[in-house]
Amino acid sequence: MSRSGSEEERFSSDEGMEELGDFIVSDEEPNHESARDDDAEVHNDRLLQMTSTLKPNESQTQKLLRAHISVLVSALGGPDHTSPISPPPYKLGQDALACLKDIKRWIKSVDEKKGNFDVALACADSGLVVNDLLVILCQWDSQQNSKKPLKNARTMEKIMLSCLELLVLLTWPTDLNSESSENQKLHFASVRKSQIVYKKHILAYNKGQTLKAVIRLVLPTIAKHRIDREPRDNAILRLVLFFIRNVLNIEPANSSISTKSRKHVTNLDNLPTNVNYDDISMNAVLSCFKNNKVLMFLLTLSGSLGTDFDKETFGQPCLECIYLIIKGVKTQDILNPQQNSKQQQRYQQQQREQSQQDQNPIQSVTTTSGLELQDLLSEESKRKKFQTQNISTRHGRFGSLLSIQGNNTSYVISGQEALLDTNSSLAKLDESKKWNNRSHFKYDSDDYVKATSEFLNGSSVIILKEFIEQFLSGGCFNTLIECIGWLLSGTNDLNYVDDYEKACYFLTVAWFLNYKRERNVLFDILGTANLDEDDDGLDYGSVSAGLSEVNFILIISYFRESFEAKNWNSLHVAMICFKELLLISYSIFSRFSDRGLQGEEEADDDQEEIDKELAEGIIRKLFSFNDFLNIVIQIPQTASKHSPEYLSVCISVVHIILKSFESFANENIKLYIQTKRKRTKQNKKSINTLDKATEESLRDVIEGSDDELENERVKEVSRERRLDFKVTEVRFFQTSIVSTYVEYLSRYEELTHEEIKRCLSYFHRLFVIRKDFTGLYRMDFMYILQKLRSYLPKGSSTRDHVDEFIYYFMKKFKNAFERFPNPVEILFPRFEDMEYKIFLATGDLYLKPEKNNKRSSVKIAKNIEFIRDNFSLDEKLKILVTVLYIQEKESLVTWVIQELTKITTNRLMNLSSEQIESNTNEAVQLYPLEQHRRLLINNPYIRLLLTLVGFKVPFILEEPCELPDNVETSNLTECLDSIKMWSNKQPVTFDDGKDAMFFLRTKEGYNYEQDDDYDGHYDENDESIAFETGANPDGERHNLNELDELDKLEAALEGKSNKDTDLPRGVARIKNKKPKKDLPKKSKANSRKKHLSRRPPKSFKVVSDGEEEKQEKTKSAEFVHGSDDESDYEKENEFFDREERLRRLLEESGGIVNPKQLAEFKVSWSKLESSNGTDTAISVSKAIENTSFVEDTMPHTQNIPEELTLGAINESNSDIDTSSDSEPELNGSGAESVSAIENDKTSVSSFTPDIHNETSSKKRHIILQDRDSEDEVDITTGNHEIKASNPRKRRVVISDDEE
């Protein structure tokens, strides 16, 4: 057995040496030959002899590693006992720097890469930090103070930096979580104990001289200018900050992961031997930091961030140091030291008297242990006092039993507290029960919040208060928070920032805001006489960075992201910071309200106005988004499932919000909140039930200015609404939040009187002010209220409030109990449905009101018709009833039959003789059932069925289905019989086996399918409507009915044949469109341009191409133009001037200017049609001559000045559109004339009201052209130009050139 054991040791040793072979230096050659017999001697190695014995839970590799670290530490150096100096100085080894670097390599390669603590434990066992590193640094600092020249100063500095690096690595914070490796879980407690030993010796050795030596290392770096610093200098400065951070962060491990315990977390006492909490407490840290200039170093560094030091490099370490200093410290302990000193003096007197009697030494009250003991003794005395109140009976010294007997059972209660009163007897009976319900609290929200507070003695309070005052008055807080806020705001997503770093930032901001607020409140009470000149002022300027816009954005983003990710630890931190912001705002308002009630007048009105704006700005910035307010309301609903500290913060936030909203409502302050919703662009809607061609043409006219909305179907818009404080307050009184308050109050023994009053204030607001009685008719609440009353002392003011509330509560509950003798509902939380609320409160049934909003409406069904008009009424009803049965709408047919039966019966029974003689009936309105109401809107078959019967079908949900009085009873009876008959004969078959749907089709006209957003409602107060959509009598698109005959008029003037139409003679048919397959493919831009060119202009103005492009850029100018009031008068004058010129030209040229001329034109045209004229141009010329529109001679042209030149023609030609899409087709000589004009580079438009937008100057050309020759007369009125031509038969083309 021994032989096999030695072989296993040898094999494990070989494996360990292979694993650590890179770091082992051996002079021996490796022997790879195997032993030939079992008795061969094992290689005698010094390291192997040191690792022959293993400790529990230790491997051979770990033992070998420990031996190598021990060798390196020994080679580093040690005390020089040959020196006559006592104590002997430390003497470095010859290769001290190499040893330090080797140890660093071991830590990096083993501990960090493999996730182990083996090297750290080996260094702790060898005493590297305590016996070597600290001694080396302190001895070097003493030599620097003596100002004696040092040998090898450069090498010594390198050794000091290596010592600092090892100190930082060995004191680096270690955390235990579920992701830790097995090695880390196993050795976590040992590593933490070793770090506690390091912290004790760092603070105690030579009164913390190690810290002074470390700061001395970085002094040359600080003295350099920022530009002159090298990366190495910044690395040294960063190492010093990390070392200070590590010293502050080292604390005893208070928890470890356990897989066997139900709680999964086991509390342990992890203080090593010979170390007590006073050695590493905050009192010792602050005293050591003060004596060794560490606090001054932090002030210098944090105040110079961004200017002398890089904020990205040093900002976060500085913030962590400040956070760890103030962590767990209550601001009241710093601001009220007198109260603490009185308690300490009282406690010292009591302990002194007790020690004289017992002759036992006591712990000093100035130590941390003494302060902690004082707190525990005060809690014990309070509990003893409560216990003596309950057991002070006449039989207090005797044991007794109390028997409670029922019909079949009996209970026996023992104990003196059961004899006090009935409540105590029942409580004792409840204590005897076995409870199996487990705690529902999840302590998953306190990782960054320290539950236990720090106990500071008098000297530590003075040191910390002085540091805080200097930190605020010197602007260090603002500089530090601005730098960290800049770093956080520069990150695209806060999720990529470490949670601990974010927690440090927000907790630091919250602590200093709390300190500043409490300090201002204290000086308001005591006055400013105790305020020194160097102290911080009473305004909030020293913490302005915490109230900046950047910080509000960060806190809201951090709040929202933590809630969405269900990161309760981060959410707890966010709520603490959020609470402090609310408290600052509320404290300012409460201070001003108190001054107003007392009638005090403030001399500094400017400062008061600034504070008011600050308070309002805080609330406005925090509650500027509706979704954030929703999150704030949702958080308290589940707060009872988490830790008591988390629950307490949630209750405080709700309390402050309600108080702030109340103050805002009293001050009549308006708060606007942004809400986000999704707005769907409404599809293009048809104007009237017109044919498709007219509908498409008019749609371009109406919605031509809405091109910018066509690219975006769904658009998210933001709008601001005024926050209704009363409505928002109601949301904080949901049943789930009430349950949270009840759960919070159930811990009344752990609550202060202020916290109990906070709960009572909430219940008073709910029950008394809002009179929501049923919300508190709960058995658990009544039971807690009764226990709370018994717990509070009789002389307490809180008990008086509880008594008053109980009296009012029972008075209302008695009335409710009389109405409901069996109140089963009090056993459960109330339902939030209005039916239950109204019934429990009043006993009445709740009638749910019909919603009158857009979303409750439905689309209007398409209009359908029969494929033939010769169907009889009976056949039509047969088809519709069959379709409804196919769609499984039998209930709808049954409802129609029932309603028709009622109407006919009432008419036959209620008609008097006078009504029979007069043959008059009353109109009937039908209000369908809820399940049928929507079908009357969106089902076309039932709508057609009711229409056939004679009903007027509704178009919106609120509109009834009305039967006019002119519908005869006989017709109703006939329809009723037919519907009954075909309903009973279902299923019905048709000829040729066709389906009933075959005989129906959709009407042409209004396209309801595109109108999918129409709901029949219009709310004039709806904020989503930008402007009124009614016709504007002054607008440019008012007379849309004038556009109805555009296509007809165009076809008539083009002279196309109407042989394929059924229109009467003299009426132009609608122009045929080319099939889509024959049309060339064009881009959307060209298609859009073509539609615009074919579009009738606004108010029939002739617009040039340049102006068209200009108007395309200006969208909806009629409604959104910024200078409408200034430019309307000029536009009107310009418009009337153009119209006057056009009218004058028409009169001079013989145009149609009155209805008489138009009638004559129609008569002449009809005669030409009857004479079978083939040439349209000839017909037009004859019609013009017969109606004397244009004379052969031109007397009006003779009066035009001769200064006119031909330049106007060339000028107008450049602006004329010669597109083939817009040119009309001419037959015969008309076509020849067009070609002739094109050859002359002159464009002639057709005589049609569909005037193309083909000019851009403010001139009008009248081109008189002979159809037989190319001679022409050009009359230009703008520049007075005349071009003479052959005065024969001519046709007139009018074009409007204007910009």
UniProtKB/Swiss-Prot annotation:
Similarity-based family: Belongs to the timeless family.
The protein's name in its UniProt record: Topoisomerase 1-associated factor 1
Basic and acidic residues bias locations: 1-13, 29-41, 1052-1063, 1110-1134, 1251-1267
Keyword Plastid attributed: no
PANTHER family for the chain: PROTEIN TIMELESS HOMOLOG, TIMEOUT/TIMELESS-2
GO cellular component terms given for this protein: replication fork protection complex
Residue ranges, annotated region (Disordered): 1-41, 338-364, 1052-1134, 1209-1299
Compartments, as annotated in UniProt: Nucleus
Keywords: Cell cycle, DNA damage, DNA repair, DNA replication inhibitor, Meiosis, Nucleus
Residue stretches of biased makeup (Low complexity): 338-360
Biological role: Involved in chromosome segregation during meiosis and DNA damage repair.
Pfam families reported in the protein's UniProt record: TIMELESS
GO BP term, pick one: DNA replication checkpoint signaling
Gene Ontology MF annotations: DNA binding
Superkingdom as given in the UniProt entry: Eukaryota
Organism of provenance: Debaryomyces hansenii (strain ATCC 36239 / CBS 767 / BCRC 21394 / JCM 1990 / NBRC 0083 / IGC 2968)
Listed Basic residues bias regions: 1082-1098
Ranges of Acidic residues composition bias in the record: 15-28
